[in-house]
Regions:
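PP2C/PPM-type serine/threonine phosphatase catalytic domain
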Residues: 1-166
Length: 166
């Protein structure tokens, strides 16, 4: 399997500060993107800590080759953010989304919390690998076959209100 990777982040036109962090490490076969929660203080710190801790937990290419190992890594990052977030921000803590990929031989493992999406570009075009953890997606998941809902029928905040984060 051939992987091509690239990382770039930009504040865009809407926000004043960029709370995104990312990691591209072809040597280790690890990739991450995190977006600090804008509703909590220290979003950029949370995303940076999550990505740096992920990098530290995967010390080399011989570590983390199963879904359960990657799940344990993400849970470890969550615990780390809870413990250290309280030191920085008190009871409110800090929060971030996190999507990580681990290239393990002929497969790619994914860990995902929040709405930082992962995509693959292949012969079928660009395909989304992750599922957003938002109120909007929760409602869409509850629809029965044949049912649909128009995007404009949902309150605006449903599109970006997270149901899961670190």
């Amino acid at each position: 399997m051939k992987l091509l990777s690239f990382g770039y982040t930009d504040v865009g036109f809407v926000r004043e500060s960029n709370e995104d962090s990312f990691l591209v490490s072809d040597e280790k076969g690890i990739y991450a993107v995190a977006d600090g929660l804008g509703g909590l203080p220290h979003g950029s710190l949370a995303s940076r800590m999550a990505v740096q801790f992920f990098d530290a937990m995967i010390a080399n290419a011989d570590v983390c080759h199963t879904e359960s190992e990657l799940e344990n890594v993400v849970k470890g990052i969550h615990r780390f953010l809870i413990e250290n977030g309280e030191k920085v921000a008190g009871e409110d803590g800090i929060g971030t989304t996190l999507t990580v990929l681990r290239s393990a031989g002929d497969k790619v493992l994914m860990g995902h919390v929040g709405d930082s999406a992962a995509f693959v570009l292949n012969g079928n075009g660009l395909q989304k690998l992750s599922k957003d953890h938002t109120l909007e997606q929760e409602i869409l998941d509850k629809l029965k076959p044949g049912e649909s809902i128009e995007e404009q029928d949902l309150p605006e905040y449903y599109h970006h209100t997270l149901t899961r984060c670190l």
